[in-house]
Amino acid sequence: MSVRLPSSMSYGEEEEPDVLQKMWDKSKQQPFVPLGSLLTAGAVLLAARSMKRGEKLKTQRYFRYRIGFQLATLVALVGGGFYYGTETSQHKQTREDKLREKAKQREKLWIEELERRDAIIQARKQRLEESKKELRELAKQGFIEEKESNDKKED
């Protein structure tokens, strides 16, 4: 008989979001940061293109835009950090409460699974005892019949 863990048992299967999901969630929280990053990248690309064409004034303008976009991105990042800093502690508390609730639910499922398995084992033991008792009675009956038939033959 192989011993398997109950189906309610899981190891570290917390629904951890992958990297892309985390990035998407953070982008939803602070939409100005990715926007500023995209604008900065666009300004750098335009500056590189104008530099390649030899347009010095446009190149300087695009690099100035890049600095402005980087500053705006940094301000958005710091401002969002302050704003979401207090919310993060509340979110962390909520997450811990959810994890506690999930642990209680798993413990309950684990206990139910163990009780179910115990009931199955007890039922098997009872059937085994009943089968043994029935076999003993049949064997006893067979011996009695054999003894009676031997007694009749001797008479």
Swiss-Prot record:
Functional summary from the UniProt entry = Cytochrome c oxidase subunit which plays a role in assembly of respiratory supercomplexes.
Q: For this UniProt entry, what is the primary localization, expressed as one broad class?
A: mitochondrion
Q: Which GO terms describe its cellular component?
A: mitochondrial inner membrane; mitochondrion; plasma membrane; respiratory chain complex
**Keyword set, alphabetical order:** Coiled coil, Membrane, Mitochondrion, Transmembrane, Transmembrane helix
Q: Which residues cross the membrane?
A: 32-49, 62-84
Q: Which ranges of the sequence are coiled-coil?
A: 111-141
Task: Summarize the subunit comment.
Answer: Associates with the respiratory chain complex III/complex IV supercomplex.
**What is the designated name of this protein?**
Respiratory supercomplex factor 1, mitochondrial
Query: How does this protein lie in the membrane?
Result: Multi-pass membrane protein
Domain named HIG1 is located at 4-95
Q: Which family does it belong to?
A: Belongs to the RCF1 family.
Q: State its location(s).
A: Mitochondrion membrane
Q: Which GO terms describe its biological process?
A: mitochondrial cytochrome c oxidase assembly; mitochondrial respirasome assembly; regulation of proton transport
Q: What superkingdom does the record give?
A: Eukaryota
